[in-house]
Amino acid sequence: VILGFESFETANAYGQALGEQDGILKKLITTVEAPAPQTYFLRHRSLIPEGVSIAAVTIAPHALDAFYAFTSAFKAKVLLDTSRASAETMKGLPPNYELAWNHTTLRALRVDPAITYLQVRYGDEGALARAHRILAKYREELIGHHEFIRFNGRVEFAGLTLVRFTSEDRLNEIISDHEKMGAFVFNPHRYTLEEGGMKQTDAIQLAFKRENDPKGLLNPGKMIAFEDPNFDFASGQSYLFPGLEARAAAAQG
């Protein structure tokens, strides 16, 4: 099912509420901010009005009645229900899971090769409000995309925000500002475990690496702590594996 909402905020409020309905069996809750669905979901253009943000969900057939009873309390418009749509409507349409997670990013890239993305966690308390504040601040550069998940028994969401890329410096500014505003970015533009994740040494990972790959033959340069135990993660500088320094210098001319 694809539902339309007047704003990304209302789509997310719905996504959070639907995720918390344990009696409605579902597999996917994805929210995407306008104008991304209209611009990047090419096969769905005739179904999604301009300015409408969407929630793409996958609901078990036996739970559809309960799903619609729940959804009736929200200002949501049903744009597509594959259980009711005609064969003509369904012709050529991908399943909802191909609009979700990094499929969303890939569809955007097919239309605009300058698009990139960030992986964001917005904390616990006030996560939705925090996400909306960040998106509002960077309205010309960011487009919201959230995936609702169950984590440690709680319904949360992950941000796979679409970014209109202009420069590496600007991207780093946006990442830094996310963190100043209380969000945490798992940076997909870094190749090391630490920079792409928790930005600190994982002692268990490091011990496992030393035990099983003492000479560092597997994925060299992937773990900063193995190559440079004294690296300062607070410096704001990207780590460059020594074997790549010459190549990087050559690329910069």
Predicted segment positions?
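Conserved glycine-rich FAD pyrophosphate-binding loop
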Residues: 33-39, 44-50, 71-253
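A conserved active-site cap/scaffold subdomain adjacent to cofactor or substrate pockets
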Residues: 1-30, 37-80
